[in-house]
Amino acid sequence: MAEAEKTVRTLTGRVVSDKMDKTITVLIERRVKHPIYGKYVKRSTKLHAHDETNQCHIGDKVTIRETRPMAKTKSWALVDVLERAVEV
């Protein structure tokens, strides 16, 4: 029997914190339609992701994937930095 390949969940968001060692906080924003009024409303969630090389900084646009739990609240890992933040 061949094992079925699992689909890996990936999300895209902005880094809002890089103060922890090898960990970033990513803000994921999505739009959902209100069930009664039909207006689109922004919903967001913050996820902790593993950044092995500490390459991300605040404001970077990144892609993360779901992985095994690495800590109590960290079960996502950095895949790619899509866009660097503008340095002032």
Swiss-Prot record:
GO cellular component, one term: cytosolic small ribosomal subunit
Record-linked InterPro entries: NA-bd_OB-fold, Ribosomal_uS17, Ribosomal_uS17_bact/chlr
Family, similarity comment: Belongs to the universal ribosomal protein uS17 family.
Name of the protein described by the UniProt record: Small ribosomal subunit protein uS17
Keywords: Ribonucleoprotein, Ribosomal protein, RNA-binding, rRNA-binding
GO terms (BP aspect): translation
HAMAP family: Ribosomal_uS17_B
Assembly and binders: Part of the 30S ribosomal subunit.
GO terms assigned for molecular function: rRNA binding; structural constituent of ribosome
Pfam families, per the entry: Ribosomal_S17
PANTHER family: 40S RIBOSOMAL PROTEIN S11 FAMILY MEMBER, SMALL RIBOSOMAL SUBUNIT PROTEIN US17M
Role played: One of the primary rRNA binding proteins, it binds specifically to the 5'-end of 16S ribosomal RNA.
